Design a protein with these regions (language model features):
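Structured catalytic core of nucleotide-sugar glycosyltransferases
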Residues: 1-130
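A ubiquitous structural signal for well-ordered alpha-helices
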Residues: 21-24, 28, 53, 108, ...
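Hydrophobic helical membrane-anchoring modules
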Residues: 1, 180-269
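Acceptor/aglycone-binding surface of glycosyltransferases and processive sugar-polymer synthases
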Residues: 63, 67-71, 75-85, 90, ...
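Alpha-helical structural elements of signaling/regulatory helical domains
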Residues: 13, 17, 34, 173-177, ...
Length: 269
C-alpha cells in the first residue's frame, strides 16, 4: 500500500497563481507514482476569485479538497486548519506562488522515508529580488532570534516542508491562538534536513506581506519564543518602583522629621 502525502496550500488572493501552481504540482505527482496524494487548499478569506478557482480545480481532481474561511484570519490560521484536515502519513506545506520549488518534494520524501529524518524543509540562502530594507530587517530578525531565544529559528527557513505524522501531531497539540510556526517547527524538536536554494520570484500576483505585517509577525515571534522581552519589562518595572519608593521617602521625610530641612541646609553649607 502506498504512503499518502497530504499537501496543505494556504491561499489568499491567489486566483492568478493557483492554476499555474496546480499545473506544476500535477507534474510532480505524476513523477511520484509510488505515493498517493491528497491536496488541501485553504481559502483564507480571499477577496478575488480564489474560491471559485478552487472549486473548479476540485471538480476535475478527486484528490483535491478545499476549506474556506469566513474572513481573512492570516496564513498561520490557514496552515493550522490545513494540517487538521490533512489525513496523510506525510504532510507538506506549500505556497501557491511557486516561490518554493515544488520539485523539492521528491527529495524531501526521500529524506523522511529513507534517510531517517522526521522533516525536510526548504531554506532560502539568497534574497535576490527583495527590497533592500526588507532583506535588512529579515537578517536582523534572525540574528535577534538567535541571541534571544533558545528555540532554533534557521535563517531563511521557509514554511515549505514535508513532515511525518508524529511531527504533524506534535504541531497540532500546540493550541496557541497567536501561532508562530517558524518557531514551533523548531520547538517541537525532531530531526530536520534543510534543503538550500536561491530566491525565486512569485509566478503571478503580488505578495500579501507588507513591511508592517512582517514587522508585527516578527515581534510576535520574538515575544512568543524568547523570555528576554519579559525579563526586560520586569527590570524596567522594578527600576521605576525603586525610583518611586525613593521619591516617596524624600517627600515624606520633612513631615516625619521636623529638623530634616535644617539638616539639609547644614549639609549644604
Amino acid at each position: 500500500m502506498n504512503d499518502l502525502i497530504s499537501i496543505v496550500v494556504p491561499c489568499y488572493n491567489e486566483s492568478e497563481a493557483l492554476p499555474k501552481f496546480i499545473e506544476v504540482l500535477d507534474g510532480i505527482i505524476a513523477k511520484m507514482d509510488y505515493a498517493d496524494f491528497q491536496v488541501v487548499l485553504v481559502n483564507d478569506g480571499s477577496r478575488d476569485k480564489t474560491l471559485e478557482v478552487m472549486k473548479a480545480i476540485a471538480q476535475t481532481r478527486p484528490y483535491i479538497k478545499y476549506v474556506s474561511f469566513s474572513r481573512n484570519f492570516g496564513k498561520e490560521a490557514g496552515m493550522y486548519a490545513g494540517l487538521t484536515y490533512a489525513d496523510g502519513d506525510y504532510v507538506a506545506i506549500m505556497d501557491a506562488d511557486l516561490q518554493d520549488p515544488p520539485e523539492f518534494l521528491i527529495d524531501m520524501y526521500e529524506a523522511v522515508t529513507k534517510e531517517g529524518y522526521d522533516c525536510a524543509a526548504a531554506r532560502r540562502v539568497t534574497r535576490k529580488g527583495e527590497p533592500p530594507i526588507r532583506s535588512f530587517f529579515a537578517r536582523m530578525f534572525y540574528k535577534l532570534m538567535g541571541r534571544m531565544s533558545t528555540t532554533e529559528v534557521v535563517d531563511g527557513a521557509r514554511d515549505f516542508r514535508l513532515m511525518n505524522r508524529k511531527f504533524v501531531d506534535a504541531l497540532l497539540n500546540c493550541r496557541e491562538y497567536n501561532r508562530f510556526s517558524k518557531g514551533m517547527f523548531g520547538w517541537v524538536g525532531f530531526k530536520t534536513k534543510w534543503i538550500a536554494y536561491e530566491n525565486v520570484e512569485r509566478v503571478a500576483g503580488q505578495t500579501k506581506w507588507n513591511f508592517w505585517s512582517l514587522f508585527k509577525y516578527s515581534i510576535e515571534g520574538i515575544v512568543a519564543f524568547s523570555t528576554t522581552p519579559l525579563v526586560f519589562a520586569s527590570f524596567i518595572g522594578l527600576l521605576f518602583c525603586f525610583i518611586a519608593f525613593v521619591a516617596v521617602i524624600f517627600y515624606l521625610l520633612p513631615y516625619l522629621t521636623p529638623s530634616f530641612p535644617s539638616i539639609l541646609v547644614s549639609a549644604t553649607i
